[in-house]
Structure formats: structure tokens, C-alpha cells
């Protein structure tokens, strides 16, 4: 049985397939802007962003990045960075959930005693009167699974952990 691919080519790390709906996350003008940015970073024009491309791009901006810094940037991707992977990574950053510390710090702004909790009535008032206002029904839904103690303290540190990692088992 002959293989169409040479075995020597299989040692190269192949890009992981990005979700097919990645292009649906952005409108056409945004995709064009990302393509222009990708092309500016892809200094050697091989269709992939590699460590050397990042180094050259940063050097052209007057930066002198260390190998460790460049490695950390490259390790953000699960494989070689083609345009689809580049778009997927930005989509996750722009449209995905916020990092855990960002969510926690947003709650902490309203925790005057810095103890990791917010009084449930106060939080309800904030959620229904500020920013993108929640309805009472939406707050009720939020509170259904929220970590609220018997005194009515909403534990936002635990809530943030639940948002990012899921609820603990009841057996714990």
C-alpha cells in the first residue's frame, strides 16, 4: 500500500484545524484588517507566523525581544500559526470570556471591605441599574447556582472560579 505523503513530511508539526465558524465571528472589514496585520507580521511571506517573523516585526518597532519572550508568544498557539489560527486566537481573545483575574477584579471594585464577597441585595441593585442592565429574572437565574452564604453574601471569588472551571461536585 503506497502513501501519497512522504513519511519525512509527517515529522513537521501540523496546524490544528481551527473551528470552521471562526470567519463568522467577524465582519468582512475586520477580517481584512486582521489579514493586513497577519501579512505585516509574516515577514518572510510563507503563510505562517514563526518565531523569526515575530522577532523581525518587534525589531522593526525598536524592540529587542528575548528568546523566552518570543517562545512564550509562540506557545500561545497549539501549532503553527497560519491565518485561520491567527484569526481564531484573536477571536478567542476578543470574543471569548475574560480571564479569571479580570472578572474577579471587576467584582472587587464593589467589595469595599476587600473580603471576597458582595452583599447580594447590593449586587442585585448594581446589576439592574448599571451598565448592561440585568432584569430581575436574569439576576434570579444568576443567584440560583451562585455561592451565597446564609447572611446573603455573594462570594465572587468562588463564583469566578465556577464560571471558569465549573461547579465543585456536591460530594466534596
From Swiss-Prot:
Chain ranges passing through the membrane: none
Gene3D superfamilies to which the protein is assigned, alphabetical: EF-hand
Modified residues (Phosphothreonine): 19
Modified residues (Phosphoserine): 20
Family matches, as Pfam families: EF-hand_7 (PF13499)
Binding site for Ca(2+): 42, 44, 46, 53
Domain of life of the native organism: Eukaryota
PTM comment: Phosphorylation increases the actin-activated myosin ATPase activity and thereby regulates the contractile activity.
Listed GO MF terms: calcium ion binding; myosin heavy chain binding
SUPFAM superfamilies in the record: EF-hand
Annotated region described as Disordered, given as residue ranges: 1-20
Basic residues biased stretches: 1-16
Domain EF-hand: 29-64, 98-133, 134-169
A Gene Ontology term for the protein's cellular component: cytoplasm
Database matches in PROSITE patterns: EF_HAND_1, EF_HAND_2
Keywords: Calcium, Metal-binding, Motor protein, Muscle protein, Myosin, Phosphoprotein, Repeat
Subunit (UniProt): Myosin is a hexamer of 2 heavy chains and 4 light chains.
Additional information: This chain binds calcium.
Biological function: Myosin regulatory subunit that plays an important role in regulation of both smooth muscle and nonmuscle cell contractile activity via its phosphorylation. Implicated in cytokinesis, receptor capping, and cell locomotion.
Name of the protein in its database record: Myosin regulatory light chain RLC-A
Source organism per UniProt: Rattus norvegicus (Rat)
